[in-house]
A protein has these predicted regions:
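Bacterial N-terminal signal peptides that target proteins for export
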Residues: 1-11
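Short intrinsically disordered, low-complexity coil segments enriched in acidic
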Residues: 2-3, 18, 25
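Bacterial N-terminal signal peptides
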Residues: 10-20
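Structured catalytic-domain cores with a bias toward divalent-metal coordination
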Residues: 22-453
């Protein structure tokens, strides 16, 4: 709890104690929300008739309870979910439940919006038990360093423990700010495993990735030369092949083979980085290429669940003409891309506070959400029946309720920072099913818990 909120709580407690000496206890005054417009009331009736309630996993409700989304997902190759309201306890459990449900439908990977190479360390852990997942969740940043994400990682580990590689669920990151960690893994194999000569060869071949990443794009030099990148693609491919051959030569040395296999996986990341770098794509197309590449790791029949922060998984262009990666992903996959938005009606989230006069947000704390804006999706959904709802928006028609639900209409957008004071909108306009095929709504959010060391 923040100092400001603690002070307010103490003042409120003192006031109540003084008041109780002179007056009898009176029930708190609950201010009813403004009545819905006729069209919003029609939308509420539609939601109550069509929404499907679901159970969020917790100690009382195991993850074996299935999410009601199989028909919605259909033959989708990629399911993207936008975490519009970040910092809740509930969302990681919902993603865990979705993954458990869709594992029987060939979903073989979860990709989060985090650095790819570092997240590969968590992938190695869930598949083999090697490594320290808490260390790597810390490395991914505050958003991922929570008890809820750790619980999700442990669930994937237990799922994978008794399954072969083809049936396991992978844990990936779909951003590559740089390939530094991948290169470190590739170039630090012990000489006792790879040999000094082999390691020297690998370091020479892979150096081009570092050169390309450190160069200034659009200026004179190798990074502006397609010939350089073509050579780099060939060099990284030779490293991948050489590590595969080394792994074969290490037959009978299981620990050494596992070490080399992981280095080969990191070499594939570097190879993919070089391949995408050659094409000099804008950010949204680059990220889309990462997502589609991760989907390919699951095989021709494998599918991928994508956890996008804020509106990343939406088919939309935001402020400043910022195009989201889901736009090119959907263009490539067509109806084999499905997506959902997640939002919360009220409650408390974990976020970094920002207030008037602050140039930078403060450290993370628990923050109470402001009441929903009148006319917003949350304002209407807060009055729906049920605590947690899944709504398939693809069935909207042309009646009054459907017109209201289609939008554009505002929804919460809490992306790492927030203010309990009335500054900033912390909202984004949505349209259904143009931006999202469906919606996941939780009426009362509670804050995520920082991961204990």
């Amino acid at each position: 709890m923040s100092t400001r909120r603690t002070t307010l709580a103490l003042c409120a407690t003192a006031t109540l104690m003084l008041g109780s000496a002179c007056h009898s206890n009176t029930p708190p005054v609950i201010v009813a929300p403004p009545p819905l417009s006729d069209s919003a009331a029609a939308a509420l009736r539609w939601v109550n008739a069509h929404a499907v309630p679901f159970t969020i996993p917790d100690s009382m409700h195991p993850v074996t309870d299935r999410m009601p989304i199989m028909d919605f997902v259909g033959n989708a190759r990629v399911l993207g979910v936008s975490e519009l309201t970040e910092g809740t306890h509930q969302f990681a459990g919902i993603m865990q439940s979705i993954l458990a449900t869709l594992s029987s439908r060939g979903f073989r990977g979860l990709a989060i919006q985090a650095p790819m190479a570092e997240t590969m360390e968590i992938d190695r852990y869930v598949r083999t038990g090697t490594g320290d997942p808490k260390r790597w969740l810390r490395a991914l940043g505050l958003h991922w360093n929570t008890q809820e994400i750790f619980t999700l990682v442990q669930w994937v580990r237990e799922y994978d423990r008794s399954r072969g590689p083809a049936e396991q669920i992978g844990f990936y990151g779909f951003e590559i700010p740089n390939a530094a960690h991948a290169l470190q893994v590739i170039t630090t194999l012990p000489d006792s495993v790879a040999g000094a000569g082999f390691n020297a060869f690998v370091r020479r071949q892979i150096q081009c990735v570092t050169t390309g990443e450190s160069a200034a794009w659009g200026r004179e030099g190798p990074a502006s030369d397609s010939t350089f990148w073509n050579r780099c693609r060939a060099a990284t491919a030779s490293v991948v092949d050489s590590l595969g051959a080394l792994q074969s030569r290490l037959a009978g040395r299981s620990s050494a083979q596992a070490m080399v296999a992981f280095a080969q996986q990191m070499a594939r990341v570097a190879q993919h980085d070089a391949d995408v770098g050659l094409r000099r794509l804008p950010r949204h197309e680059t990220v889309a290429e990462h997502i589609l590449w991760l989907a390919s790791l699951a095989g021709s029949d494998g599918n991928l669940l994508v956890w996008g922060r804020d509106v990343e998984s939406g088919r939309l262009t935001g402020e400043g003409n910022v195009v989201q990666s889901a736009v090119p992903v959907a263009k490539t996959l067509g109806d084999r891309y499905r997506n959902l938005a997640f939002t919360v009606g009220e409650g408390v989230v974990r976020a970094q506070p920002i207030n008037v006069g602050q140039r930078e947000p403060g450290g993370e704390t628990d923050m109470r959400l402001r009441p929903p804006r009148v006319g917003s999706y949350e304002d209407m959904l807060d009055r729906a029946s049920g605590e947690a709802l899944f709504i398939d928006m693809r069935t909207l028609g042309t009646d009054t309720a459907s017109t209201w639900l289609k939008g554009p209409r505002s929804a919460r957008l809490v992306s790492g920072i927030y203010s309990e004071n009335p500054i900033g909108s912390f909202e984004t306009p949505l349209q259904f099913p143009t931006y999202y095929d469906g919606l996941l709504f939780v009426k009362h959010g509670t804050p995520a818990t920082p991961l204990r060391r």
